[in-house]
Amino acid sequence: ATAICYFDPVSSPTIVAAEWYRAWGLPASRQAQAAIKGPIAAHLASGRVLPLIDDLVNSGMSVVGVGALEDLREVKAACRDRISILGNLNGIAMTRWTPAEAEIAVKKAIAQAAPGGGFILSDGHGEIPWQVSDEVLHAIVAATRRWGTYPLQAGLADGA
């Protein structure tokens, strides 16, 4: 595998206090990480990650999965040059998107998190609902190819 994703949904500060994660979740994560030979992505099942970025970086994670509720600009600032970002398209909202709305969401995510590298566009939870239309999925792919190729286009600077 290129990387392993370590899903740890209960450790997000959305669900438990960050202190609890540091006391119980982080030691369990480090134990699991020791058995994995290669890059690891931490995914807290679409919960908030910002309060734990330093912990995830210090634990040796290479990538952090970011949920749709997180501000990508804030996460990017906290992660810059230390850990890559995976996310954060809203899979639930995708079920109602038009292709045009899909392009707007992709462009916005890329504008907020891709400059300088270290960003992998994905949904924000680790699975896309089957109710998302093929048309929207194809629009996401097309928009990613259009807006997510380096060097990034100057039109992305405004994030809209």
Predicted regions mapped to residue ranges:
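Active-site loop segments of alpha/beta catalytic cores
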Residues: 1-160
